[in-house]
Amino acid sequence: MSTSETTTTHTYRKEPTMRNSHYRTLVVIPNYNGLRFLPDCMEALSRQTVTDFTVLVIDNASGGDDITWLHTWQAEDPARRQLLLNDANLGFSGAVNQGIRLAMEEGYNFTLLLNNDTKVRPDFIEALEKRMDQDPKGRVFALSSKMVKMHDPHEIDDAGDAYTLLGWQFQHGLGECAEKPVWNRETVVFSACAGAAMYRTALFGTVGLFDEHHFAYLEDIDVSYRAQLYGYRVLYCPTAVVEHVGSGTSGSKYNAFKVRLSARNSVYLLYKNMPALMLLVNVLPLLLGFLVKQLFFLRKGFGKEYAAGLLEGIRTRKQLEKAKLKEVPCLRYLSIELRLIDQTLEYVLQLSRKYTAKARG
């Protein structure tokens, strides 16, 4: 969410005064100096085929003209547009948790998390609500949308997130043709990308909120991992399409802040969600994954930051609350292990396709 981290978690200047009576979905948009994206993002939301939603923008102490623009935007429709202004940058996790808590208090069926550097298609919210309604038993925790690249909408940006035995996260379909049949089929995924994902609000009471120790990066993998440990599912919903710029807040694919936090959070993710036996079984591929990443970031000029992040994660891991690992059935751990193996193989194949395509020119 930003290039500065703070330990403050619940400081804000203005509570939105929402009184939900018939709206089903609360759209939560964290913002940090994202004025260049906000007009297009809000314009797309105003063209939705359903109107049973409200929009809450949570600003993480932006500078510049963001606040002036947001006040004007909110005043145009105060019943359905809400604004919460933080005095400090709470990161992605802290900001969206404020929205989720309000959604729980106000009785919204669904919480839609949306990055400010997105443009949703007109039937986006309708498609997600419709799919959630097809799950009357409430076993679907989250829906990951079909994210395509803003500069080339025919190319996939994210079709749900995966997690591997190497301790790496990757995006399904990244860079592939969005029209391929495989990306137009619903499927179970390991995690929803929280840049454009709908969550069943009530299940946060069981699964827990986003971990604010993460601040930003891998927090969506963490909450989806927990949901699976507790027996819930995460699905990829191809009918909900959104265009995405990518790295709109952090500003680049790799930078010192992002590399350090991602490294630290990768340690947090394992510590919180894998029991000791599972860590022992997977120790070799995990060590290999950390080594390869260290060498990769050395070449990129961020080797020191990656190592510092890993060490910080190891040193501070006990500050975190683990998932309720003792309550998870053994067969569920086996199921997750098999998925990690499958996703590791998929990652290798995806990488192979990418380099084969490059070689062919």
Question: Whereabouts are the PLM-identified features?
Answer:
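A conserved acidic beta->alpha catalytic loop
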Residues: 44, 59-69, 88, 118-121
